[in-house]
Amino acid sequence: MTYRVIVTPAAESDLKTAYRYIRSEAPRAARDWIRRARQSAKSLARHPERCPLAPESASFDLPIRELFVGSGNRGTYRFLFVVFDEEKSVYILHVRHGSMLPLTSGE
């Protein structure tokens, strides 16, 4: 079963911010990172439930899952998303660096 993947405006902004930061340190790595990030987002179209629940999921009404992207000295980013089985959709809510505090209900 295939899901439609929707990147919310907040997540798109998060991606751009991360890209600009990485680009300021390593332009080539930034291009590779954004390509991997977009491929990872697209991968959620197949079996999004393979990803674990995010630690902050218990604080929200909907289960929030996380997909880890990246590693090494650039760090790992978490794609935080919800799955709506009824409409076969995945909404990527935010993209956060692994060192950031957990998502709060105000974000």
Where are these regions (language model features)?
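Enriched for short, Lys/Arg-rich terminal
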Residues: 69-107
